[in-house]
């Protein structure tokens, strides 16, 4: 494939994929305006956020499987098209109920395009160039998530909250046009296996129950959701072990590299989201910073995270996945020690150094985690593997938000995050080099 076509492919995929994290974080600054428009309580409005997160978590592993069945390019196109239509629906919604429905459809579109864009890259980009391309994606996605609230606030101040959905449409239209006209032709090994409907429903029930448990505020909720988890999760595992065509092939986890790469991204995302969620409150309470200044300080974390993602991608072939992921968690341990010291310090310089180290740690290993998760998987299973990786990544953020809700006191939280980073150091030791991982794949 020529360099021109390859870059057309990458830009098209990135245009679609970058809008998913932007729309995930941009909505946060719009909740008050949406509440005023529909004259609804903030508790009701938060379902605009919650439904997006739930549907994304439920749909991603299924979307990866659909890509392997019907073609990753086909599912990517459906994802971009659905995201475009849903964005239009969100912008024009006359009621909160319809806005929530279109946000759910937006999440389905995002879930379809995210794992399938990764699978397409696996098919058409040479193995040697994969880390650099994934690094480019990580840089874009990281900046998208970091800049989402900033972009959203500018749009809302200049126009209205509807504009955060209108802005998606031209970019999605370009991505769709580019994908239809400039995508290179390549052979996809489509799976003839049928979709496991029962397994999909049990997986959905399991994930929804877990998410609702972490977000529960009702006194009866803990009992009800715990019972549902104890019902759905064992039934899902039993179904997947017995069916001939599982929605998640647990044989993939026989590879220690695949397992540890997915555990690594879960632990990494857990700590990253903990910083993003807790540090604004910490900086306000501990340092007396206002919302604007704490947001600017936190942007330092996001910028260094995105930059180190790119650096980690460049170093992947030179150092290998294990060393880079080990370095990532070791730096996270150092950052969490600094956060612990901040509990008794009021030095802004010390705060900035902590955020810089935390950002570097959160970004440098992401590309190696992604590449390692695919290294032991046949190309025909790339969609499923990418869906699993995305789901593990998402569950890290779910666990993080649950921890913050359950734990009182910054010192205790930073101690737990330090312990998580040490666990990550040991998990990284189970990741093999790319060459060893390929041998592991062939012998599986």
UniProtKB/Swiss-Prot annotation:
Membrane topology: Multi-pass membrane protein
Superkingdom field: Bacteria
Annotated Pfam families: MFS_1 (PF07690)
GO BP annotations, alphabetical order: transmembrane transport
InterPro entries the UniProt entry points to: MFS, MFS_dom, MFS_trans_sf
Residue ranges of coiled coil: none
TM ranges: 9-29, 42-62, 82-102, 104-126, 136-156, 164-184, 193-213, 217-237, 263-283, 295-315, 324-344, 347-367, 387-407, 411-431
Gene3D superfamilies (UniProt xref): MFS general substrate transporter like domains, Multidrug resistance protein D
UniProt entry keywords in alphabetical sequence: Cell membrane, Membrane, Transmembrane, Transmembrane helix, Transport
Subcellular location: Cell membrane
GO cellular component term of the entry, any: plasma membrane
A GO term, aspect molecular function: transmembrane transporter activity
Family in the record: Belongs to the major facilitator superfamily. TCR/Tet family.
PANTHER family named in the record: BLR6921 PROTEIN, MAJOR FACILITATOR SUPERFAMILY MULTIDRUG TRANSPORTER MFSC
Descriptive protein name: Uncharacterized MFS-type transporter YvkA
């Amino acid at each position: 494939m020529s360099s021109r076509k390859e870059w057309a492919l990458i830009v098209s995929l990135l245009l679609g994929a970058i809008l998913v994290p932007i729309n995930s974080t941009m909505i946060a600054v719009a909740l008050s305006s949406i509440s005023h428009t529909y004259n609804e309580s903030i508790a009701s409005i938060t379902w605009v956020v919650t439904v997006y997160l739930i549907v994304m978590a439920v749909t991603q592993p299924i979307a990866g499987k659909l890509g392997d069945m019907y073609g990753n390019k086909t599912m990517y196109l459906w994802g971009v098209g659905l995201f475009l239509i849903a964005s239009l629906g969100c912008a024009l919604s006359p009621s909160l109920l319809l806005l929530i429905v279109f946000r759910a459809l937006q999440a389905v579109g995002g879930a379809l395009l995210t794992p399938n864009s990764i699978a397409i890259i696996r098919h058409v980009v040479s193995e040697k160039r994969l880390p650099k391309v994934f690094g480019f994606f990580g840089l874009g996605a990281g900046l998208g998530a970091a800049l989402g609230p900033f972009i959203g606030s500018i749009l809302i101040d200049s126009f209205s909250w509807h504009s955060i959905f209108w802005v998606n449409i031209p970019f999605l239209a370009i991505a769709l046009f580019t994908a239809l006209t400039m995508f290179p032709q390549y052979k996809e090994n489509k799976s003839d296996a049928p979709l496991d409907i029962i397994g999909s429903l049990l997986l959905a029930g399991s994930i929804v129950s877990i998410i609702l448990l972490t977000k529960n505020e009702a006194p009866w909720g803990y009992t009800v959701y715990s019972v549902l988890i104890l019902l759905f999760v064992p039934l899902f595992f039993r179904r997947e072990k017995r069916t001939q065509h599982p929605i998640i092939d647990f044989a993939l986890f026989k590879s220690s590299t695949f397992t540890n790469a997915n555990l690594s991204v879960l632990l990494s995302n857990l700590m990253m989201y903990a910083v993003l969620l807790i540090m604004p409150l910490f900086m306000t309470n501990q340092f007396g910073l206002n919302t604007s200044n704490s947001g600017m300080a936190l942007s330092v974390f996001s910028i260094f995270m995105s930059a180190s993602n790119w650096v980690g991608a460049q170093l992947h072939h030179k150092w290998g996945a294990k060393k880079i992921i080990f370095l990532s968690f070791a730096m996270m341990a150092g950052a969490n020690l600094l956060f612990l010291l901040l509990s008794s310090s009021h030095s802004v310089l010390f705060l900035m150094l902590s955020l810089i180290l935390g950002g570097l740690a959160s970004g440098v290993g992401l590309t190696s985690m992604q590449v390692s998760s695919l290294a032991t998987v046949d190309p025909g299973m790339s969609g499923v593997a990418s869906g699993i990786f995305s789901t593990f990544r998402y569950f890290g953020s779910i666990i993080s938000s649950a921890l913050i809700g359950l734990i009182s006191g910054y010192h205790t939280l930073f101690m737990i995050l330090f312990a998580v980073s040490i666990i990550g150091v040991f998990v990284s030791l189970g990741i093999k080099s790319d060459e060893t991982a390929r041998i592991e794949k062939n012998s599986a």
